[in-house]
UniProtKB/Swiss-Prot annotation:
Name by which UniProt lists this protein: Arcadin-2
Miscellaneous information on this protein: Belongs to a conserved five-gene operon within Thermoproteales denoted Arcade (actin-related cytoskeleton in Archaea involved in shape determination).
Keyword set, alphabetical order: Cytoplasm, Cytoskeleton
GO cellular component terms, semicolon-separated: cytoplasm; cytoskeleton
Main location: cytoplasm
Location(s) in or outside the cell: Cytoplasm, Cytoskeleton
Length: 203
């Protein structure tokens, strides 16, 4: 870790009272209470205006409540303070030649709503999808159980009705059963028997 970066971390932790949270690429991360602070590092021997503002744009796209750009004194010639202030971006100048006293916050960053990180969005989507899937399954199971119980109840009612009819038939007196059976015989049955007797008597 080079000396300007060490001075920068020391200033943010010991002077500004933030907690160092790590480094990702050319960005140092700090924690200020519940807020995340990103400090972009742009230390070079030869500064380019286009590259400087490109880095500022990249910092504004990070999921941080505050963002700073840290540069060496030579970069001040390309800095437009109005642009930094209008966008709420802080500016930190690090002069290694001055040692621990060589870090100065020229422009303080303005707190802004932190962008929601894509990973957090994906996590929320996954949790919501899982919840909806479980609820849908629960509703389907409940509906299926209600339909099953309804069908079983109707089947039992039909069975009981048929059983009652059979029991009524078995409990009926013999005369009624015979009458019921004779009522089912063809009407021409008795007449046919009489004709058979007449024909036999004439033989």
């Amino acid at each position: 870790m080079d000396f300007p970066k060490v001075l920068l971390i020391r200033h943010f932790t010991e002077v500004l009272g933030m907690k160092y949270a790590g480094e990702g690429g050319e960005v140092l991360w700090f924690e200020e209470g519940l807020n995340r602070v990103a400090v972009g590092i742009y230390f070079t021997d030869l500064y380019e205006e286009a590259e400087l503002y490109k880095r500022v744009g990249a910092l504004m796209g990070l999921g941080a409540s505050k963002v700073f750009l840290a540069v060496l004194p030579d970069a001040l010639a390309f800095v437009d303070p109005r642009y930094f202030k209008a966008n709420g971006v802080g500016l930190v100048v690090v002069d290694p030649a001055k040692g621990v006293d060589g870090v100065e916050v020229k422009i303080f960053a303005r707190a802004r709503p932190a962008a929601v990180e894509p990973l957090k969005i994906d996590a929320v989507k996954a949790a919501l999808h899982e919840y909806l899937a479980s609820e849908l399954k629960r509703v389907e199971e409940s509906l299926f159980e209600k339909v099953r119980r309804y069908v079983d109840q109707r089947v039992e009612e039909v069975k009981r009705a048929l059983q009652a009819v059979e029991e009524a038939k078995r409990a009926a007196p013999p005369v009624q059963r015979a009458a019921a059976e004779s009522a089912q015989e063809p009407r021409g049955g008795i007449g046919e028997n009489e004709w058979v007797k007449i024909l036999r008597s004439k033989r």
